Structure formats: C-alpha cells, structure tokens
A protein has these predicted regions:
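Glycine-rich phosphate/diphosphate-binding loops and the adjacent beta-loop-alpha structural elements
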Residues: 312-334
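Short, solvent-exposed aromatic-acidic interface loops
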Residues: 283-296, 435-437
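Bacterial N-terminal signal peptides that target proteins for export
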Residues: 1-8
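Bacterial N-terminal signal peptides
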Residues: 9-17
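Feature captures C-terminal
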Residues: 25-27, 37-46, 50, 122-129, ...
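Acidic, metal/ion-coordinating pockets
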Residues: 22-289, 339-345, 356-359, 390, ...
Length: 505
C-alpha cells in the first residue's frame, strides 16, 4: 500500500510539473493593414521578424492559438513595388498564419497574379461576401472556417469591402459583391443555428468607420447584429485602444460586442483571450518594438532569405535625390497641398495644356511621411507606389460641384491652391471657388487628376462622366521623382504650407 501511495505521489508531482494546456481558453492573434512593412518603420516600430517573435511566444504560452491577418498585407513599400507580393505571400507561411482575408490592396496587381500567389499560401482563405465563381480566384476561398478547441467550436467568417469606387474595375472584373450588412449577421446566425458553433467571429475589411458615408462599417454591422460575438476590424487604419471606449459596441440586443484594430504597418499586434466557458473576451495590444530584437535575431534563415530582397530595396532607398525643409505627415494638409500643386506643374508641362484650372488628388494615395532633410528615391517610390497615370478632364461645373460635395462629405481631399471650398458640420458643401471666383455650374473647367479618380475611384463617380483630354503613359510617381530631382538641381527644397483648402465652417 505504501509503495502504491508513493507511485501515485510521483505521478501527481510529474503532472504538476507540466504546464497545463489552456483548453478552456483560445488565444486569437490578429494583425491588419501591414502594407508590406517588412522592416521597422521610420519611428522604429514594426518589422516581420519581431512580429514572428511575438507570435511564437504567444503560441508557446497557449497551444490553443490562432493567427489571423485581416487584409492589406501588401502595398506601401518598395518590397511590393519591386517584387509584386513575392515576399509578403511567402512570409504568410513562414509566420504561420492560420487564416487570412482579402483587403482591397490585394487586388492591386489583378486577380491572375493574386491567384498565383494564393495557391502557394497554406493559410485558410476566407471570404463570405465575395462570389469568385467567374474569376481566377474561384476555388481558393471558403465562406467560413471553424476551429475546434476541446468540445467548443469557434467560427471565423470574412466580410470584404465593396469594390465599387475603391478597386480598379479591371482588377476585379466579374467579382460579385454581396451586401456586407445583409451577409454578416445572416452568416453568424447560420453558423450558430445550423452549424452549431459556440462563437461566431467576424474578420472584417470594411473599416471601423466609413471613408465614404454611404458605405457600411463595422460599428453599423454590430449595431444591427444579434449573433456576432466579436469583430476583428481593419481597413480604416484605426488604432482601437484596449479599454479606451471604442473597443465595445452595443449590438441589436444591447449586448456589448468586443472589436479591435491595430492601426497600420504592423506596429501593434492584437490579442483576444477568449474564455470558452464564459464567453468573456480580453482584448490587448502588444507593441512591436526593439524589445523583441534579440528574439527576432534568432530567425537566421528567414533574415538571410529577406536580405536577398533587401539589397534591391536598399539600392533605391538609399539614393538621395532631394531635400525637404520640414517633416510632413502623409495625412497632413501640408503634404496634400504640395502633391496637388506639384501635380498642376507637372501635368501642365507633360500634357501641353496651359489652361488647367485646378488639380484634384486623393489623399489616400500618399502612403508615407515626408521627412525633414534628405529625401531618397526609395522614399518617393514608397510615397507614391500605385500604378496610376496623370489625366486631364474637361469637367462641366455641375460635375465639379458634385465631386466637391463628395469630398466635403469625407472631410476634404488634396486640391491645388487654385481651388477652395467650405462645408458645414453635416459635411455639406457651402461654397467653392477657383482662383477666387465661385464655381459656375454652367461653365466648363479643365481639371488635372489621376486615372484612379477619373475611373470613379474613391467614389468619384462624377469624374467618370467627363471627357478626357489627356492620359499620360507613365506612372505618376515617376513624374514626381523627376520633379523633385529638378527642384534639387535648381537649388530648391520641398516645402508647403499648412493651409486647409477644403475646410469646415
């Protein structure tokens, strides 16, 4: 009997020495809008090796862990401009993503290229409200994914943004969009009542808030939902601080639903600790900074592989071409003014059209900050990475006014110094002038812009009804690069004022 007691004690001690598997908890790791930020940003945050160190530590703490990417893994640095997704999609498997959804920028090189990359990605690819049946992406996606943890089942489904007005039509041809609000709660209900899952989690790329007021967002969907238990948000680049008040939204039944998002560029990693018994969810952020460098340095094979691509990026990134008098954040009025005024000068020269009235650009097309001091070729390439062309439109005054109404409704866009507008607290256009004169609906105006807007991007439908007088053959970023080189050769620096050209009264 004593011998049996000793054996039982030894077994008990052995069991106590083994860390308990948290079968009652699921750890969900999520990132969004990492935008090809392979290495740390200029402020020292982010980087894929650091993120991998975070992922691996969390997985070691709880084997019941899933890793999610909520879209826009690509576009925004030279890694994508030069290598067209080769780096980012290969890293999906290296970092061990379990499930991914599409952002709008995944379409930037068209669906043929995207399909070629996605065939080699092991992660489950989820899309609930896109019908790919008539596209090259057919067969690569599933509407939801269920993760079993013990006797509990957790479902993830993906809600994608309306491509109209946001994705170039040629890049999403034959893609059928299903209305996000209708699909979201219906899917969650189906998962619970038919598939009998315990939790339904929406992974979304429509935004915490709407860029275009007529489009839905995550808060609207939660507000009309009865069945969604949690939302992993993206697209709007919102940093939803844990415990800051934005991370819980009341649903249709008055229940507070957790929602999280990490800004952009992979500077933060979100964690959601789901108690599978109680349903409680604890949302948190981990900062991706230098404290992870030691752990990140251990990924020798990955870092060596990345160095093969870094050489090409660095050769461009380190080539100085101009200088700037000041720092300008990519969302600032100053950089929007500089880009729009530069556009006026450039298009007037390359088109030969001398009577251009104003320039209209999209503020979302300026992807990085302008530093004070040295400006490199790589920085200009990263700032303007898109494959868009300058165009000149002949716009009736009525269409220009309609365009300005849209711009005012979202807080303004980038316009040249000739154009000024004001709007009220409701976002309604009050007054618009060109060179100090009120815009006449009966007059025709010559407007410089880019083909993305002229094709209806950023919901600029009025521009699609206008006659094109000129379409350039080069990427507009190439023209801006040559423009800043000319400034430098003339002894001039990049500079702009903080003037608000479309402002609220």
């Amino acid at each position: 009997m004593a011998k049996l007691r000793n054996i039982m004690l030894l077994c008990l001690c052995a069991l106590m020495a083994v860390p308990a598997l948290r079968a009652d908890h699921l750890t969900i790791i999520a990132v969004n809008d990492t935008h090809s930020q392979i290495d740390p940003t200029s402020d020292g945050k982010g980087g894929v090796a650091r993120r991998r160190a975070i992922y691996d530590k969390l997985r070691a703490q709880n084997p019941n862990t899933v890793l999610i990417h909520a879209g826009d893994a690509v576009q925004g640095t030279l890694f994508f401009s030069l290598y067209r997704g080769e780096v980012e999609y290969a890293l999906m498997d290296t970092l061990g993503y379990d499930a991914i959804i599409l952002g709008n920028h995944e379409f930037d090189n068209g669906m043929e290229e995207l399909a070629a990359h996605y065939r080699d990605v092991d992660a489950v690819k989820i899309s609930t409200n896109y019908d790919f049946s008539a596209t090259p992406l057919d067969g690569l996606f599933q509407p939801y994914w269920v993760k079993a943890v013990g006797d509990k089942r957790v479902a993830f489904f993906g809600i994608n943004v309306n491509p109209e007005g946001l994705i170039s039509g040629s890049n999403c041809e034959n893609l059928r969009y299903l209305d996000a609000p209708d699909v979201a709660d219906a899917t969650a209900r189906y998962l619970k009542e038919v598939q009998h899952v315990d939790y339904a989690i929406m992974v979304s790329h429509i935004g915490y808030s709407s860029y275009e007021p007529s489009e839905p967002n995550d808060t609207l969907i939660i507000g009309h939902s009865h069945y969604i238990d949690m939302v992993i948000s993206s697209h709007s680049h919102t940093t939803i601080k844990p415990g800051g008040g934005m991370d819980r939204i009341s649903n249709a039944d008055g229940k507070m639903i957790p929602i999280g998002q990490n800004g952009k560029s992979g500077k933060l990693v979100a964690t959601y600790d789901l108690d599978l018994e109680s349903g409680d969810i604890v949302y948190n952020h981990i900062t991706v900074d230098e404290s992870w460098d030691e752990a990140a340095s251990r990924y020798t094979a990955m870092n060596t592989w990345l160095d093969n691509y870094r050489h090409g990026v660095d050769s461009i990134m380190n080539n100085p071409v101009a200088s700037s008098t000041r720092f300008m954040k990519n969302s600032s009025d100053a950089i929007q003014n500089w880009v729009s005024d530069a556009t006026m000068e450039i298009i007037t020269e390359v088109s030969g059209i001398k009577n251009i009235d104003c320039a209209i650009m999209n503020k979302g097309g300026i992807r990085t900050d302008m530093p004070k001091g040295t400006v490199t070729e790589g920085l200009i390439g990263s700032m303007f990475p898109f494959d868009n062309r300058f165009v000149v439109l002949e716009m009736p005054g009525t269409e220009l006014i309609e365009s300005l109404k849209l711009m005012c409704g979202r807080g303004g866009d980038a316009v040249s110094k000739e154009l000024k507008a004001t709007y009220n607290k409701k976002g309604e256009l009050v007054k618009a002038t060109i060179k100090g004169k009120k815009i006449d609906p009966n007059k025709t105006y010559i407007v410089a812009t880019i083909d993305y807007l002229a094709n209806g991007g950023d919901y600029m439908t009025p521009m699609t009804r206008c006659k094109r007088l000129f379409t350039d053959s080069q990427k507009y970023g190439n023209h801006i690069l040559e423009y800043v080189k000319r400034l430098e050769a003339a002894g001039k620096k990049i500079d702009a004022k903080d003037e608000v050209r479309i402002k609220e009264l």
